[in-house]
Amino acid sequence: MSKPVLQIQKLTKTYMLGKRPVQALTDVNLQVNEGEFVAIMGSSGSGKTTLLNVIGCIDKASTGQVLLDGIDVSKMPENQLYKIRRDKMGFIFQTFNLLPYLNARENVELPMEGKIKSKADRKKRASELLTIVGLSGRENHRPQRLSAGEQQRVAIARALANDPAIILADEPTGNLDTKNKHEIIKVLAHLNLTRGTTIIMVTHDNQAANHTERMLLLKDGRIVKEKEGLHLAKKNHKCPHCGSSIALKDDMCPSCKMPLYASEEIFSS
């Protein structure tokens, strides 16, 4: 059985708006196991990004406990949290945040500088990661010479740089056109299927969410619904519609011709 990578218990987060307290998260309980691909959905202001920031040790909970890879980060001081962020987490954002004066490989190398002393080893690993995300031959291109989809692939490779316990993706397809959205979500799903990469993704996109195996709906700072995603069918190599065998590369069942990822509304209001 997979071990828990993330355990959250009775988490709350309160901000002060002037003198008025605003509850962003209320009594959140969540466990994510090693190798899971989980989507967090919800309307603007529901608490999605706040939850991701707390998980990512960018913000601290007001009350409750957060265990990351067995380590309690809830009360950890900042001088220790930066090592947790560097060693245990990979971050992917809606904006790619690539340094324009560095090429693709150098951008991927940056997070490794505190962990891998050899420049040659960093260069080799960065090149390997860029190949994994489909950018072989583009290593020496600077961001301005890459398409938006390619820049996000570089950001994904950078997130994998230190072999993190978990990837946190905040609207990773938000700045992309339809074609690139589909390609990027397929890259993430492929990493999860083939490498067992644990991913938590915040998204508004129904099709992107259905590439995960578990979808959570956040409303007014609480997890109110949970639903199984179609990605789980691929892990089981079984079509959710007719039960026929499917391969990892399939987007449509070869037997019943039904799509393996849907784009319709997941959580009805």
Locate each region found by the language model.
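Flanking scaffold residues of small Cys/His-coordinated metal-binding clusters
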Residues: 3, 234, 248
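Short Cys/His-rich micro-motifs in 6-15 aa windows
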Residues: 258-267
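Short Cys/His-rich zinc-binding micro-motifs
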Residues: 240-246
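Conserved beta-strand-loop-alpha-helix hinge in the C-terminal portion
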Residues: 222-237
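Short cysteine-rich clusters marking metal-coordination/redox-active sites
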Residues: 239, 253-256
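ABC family nucleotide-binding domain
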Residues: 4-6, 11-218
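Short, charged/small-residue-rich alpha-helical element at the C-terminal edge
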Residues: 246-249, 254
